[in-house]
Amino acid sequence: MTRPNPNDQNVELNRTSLYWGLLLIFVLAVPFSNYFFN
C-alpha cells in the first residue's frame, strides 16, 4: 500500500509560503523605494 508522503506536503507548503513572503516583501519594497528615491 502506498500512502502519500507527508514530507512532500511539507515541501509544497514551504514553497508556497516562501512565494507569499517574497511577494509581500516586493509589495512593501515598492512604496519604500519610491519614498527613498524621491
UniProtKB/Swiss-Prot annotation:
Disulfide bonds: none annotated. PSII is composed of 1 copy each of membrane proteins PsbA, PsbB, PsbC, PsbD, PsbE, PsbF, PsbH, PsbI, PsbJ, PsbK, PsbL, PsbM, PsbT, PsbX, PsbY, PsbZ, Psb30/Ycf12, at least 3 peripheral proteins of the oxygen-evolving complex and a large number of cofactors. It forms dimeric complexes. One of the components of the core complex of photosystem II (PSII). PSII is a light-driven water:plastoquinone oxidoreductase that uses light energy to abstract electrons from H(2)O, generating O(2) and a proton gradient subsequently used for ATP formation. It consists of a core antenna complex that captures photons, and an electron transfer chain that converts photonic excitation into a charge separation. This subunit is found at the monomer-monomer interface and is required for correct PSII assembly and/or dimerization. One of its GO terms (biological process) is photosynthesis. GO terms for cellular component: chloroplast thylakoid membrane; photosystem II reaction center. Belongs to the PsbL family. Keywords: Chloroplast, Membrane, Photosynthesis, Photosystem II, Plastid, Reaction center, Thylakoid, Transmembrane, Transmembrane helix. InterPro entries: PSII_PsbL (IPR003372), PSII_PsbL_sf (IPR037266). This is Photosystem II reaction center protein L. The keyword Membrane applies. It is found in: Plastid, Chloroplast thylakoid membrane. Its main location: plastid. It comes from Pinus thunbergii. It is a single-pass membrane protein. Pfam families: PsbL. The chain crosses the membrane at residues 17-37.
